[in-house]
Amino acid sequence: MYLIEPIRNGKRITDGAVALAMQVYVQENLFLDDDILFPYYCDPKVEIGKFQNAVVETNQEYLKEHHIPVVRRDTGGGAVYVDSGAVNICYLINDNGVFGDFKRTYQPAIEALHHLGATGVEMSGRNDLVIDGKKVSGAAMTIANGRVYGGYSLLLDVDFEAMEKALKPNRKKIESKGIRSVRSRVGNIREHLAPQYQGITIEEFKDLMICQLLQIETISQAKRYDLTEKDWQQIDALTERKYHNWEWNYGNAPQYRYHRDGRFTGGTVDIHLDIKKGYIAACRIYGDFFGKADIAELEGHLIGTRMEKEDVLATLNAIDLAPYLGAITAEELGDLIFS
């Protein structure tokens, strides 16, 4: 089995969008003479399923404040928070009857964790690992070009406070046709490891797992495929075209409705928005503000605006709002919409 790692010019890449692009590139373009193991860890990100709505699934204000990106994957499933406290083990293998058999693909990981002292780890449900009833790993797999591509996360020491805040939407009154995530009780693996492994780094944990999975003594014994510069150029292009692209990560979201209301010195505002592919598709504004002009004109200006605060503010600031909203300012309306 070949080991492929996200290392370029001797430097480890921890951008979660790049890691996802690498997985897709490997699936579609690398056909070696053996199976492939692709482990990685990355900076904080929220990864959402193909059919999910990023706005519904996440706390957008928290993500922006902490510079945590949202990345949409090409497969279904729910939203997950990932940071450098988790190792993701991915594999690309010939389908010898293993597709859908999570017990079989998980068994080497279970044995490896037992070897490291986490003897309480066990399967739960169809595709999870738990310790003391708390989820420490979730798995998925698909068929890609006749091969089984799958993987699972291993939560060594994830920041659960950040996870809870990132995956807790704080916008009320949102209705969406997207698929909602199911929250699970989660736990960390570190506290269950043997004493000699309690202080290991995420890099050391990754290497220990690789050695156990590949049945080698040291990581230097692994059979590697090093991504070439040509490989990297295609990965770069895919990352920018898709996984760093707002249109894919947000604009590809299902249609949803959004409602906010607030009170200002200039009166009350009750705003209803329909969002389609990340843009305002319909808008209705109600309230007891004192305006002279037809409010439908202002609503029309907002239609077609990208549902990002800077875009909405740019639209509002380009209009003289006084004839429509009286004393209510663009900043007040923008803050209300994105509160």
Curated annotation (Swiss-Prot):
GO molecular function: ATP binding; lipoate-protein ligase activity; lipoyltransferase activity
Domain of life where this protein originates: Bacteria
Alphabetically ordered keywords of this record: ATP-binding, Ligase, Nucleotide-binding
Recorded catalytic activity of this chain's protein: L-lysyl-[lipoyl-carrier protein] + (R)-lipoate + ATP = N(6)-[(R)-lipoyl]-L-lysyl-[lipoyl-carrier protein] + AMP + diphosphate + H(+)
Result of changing residue 134 to R: Reduces enzymatic activity
A GO term from the CC aspect: cytoplasm
Residues noted as binding ATP in the record, renumbered to the chain: 73, 78-81, 135, 139
GO biological process, any: protein lipoylation
Record-linked InterPro entries: aa-tRNA-synth_II/BPL/LPL, BPL_LPL_catalytic, Lipoate_protein_ligase_C, LipoylTrfase_LipoateP_Ligase
Purpose: Catalyzes specifically the lipoylation of GcvH-L (SpyM50867), likely via the ATP-dependent activation of lipoate to lipoyl-AMP and the transfer of the activated lipoyl onto the lipoyl domain of the target protein.
Protein family according to the UniProt entry: Belongs to the LplA family.
UniProt name for this protein: Lipoate--protein ligase
Provenance organism: Streptococcus pyogenes serotype M5 (strain Manfredo)
High-level lineage: Bacteria, Bacillati, Bacillota, Bacilli, Lactobacillales
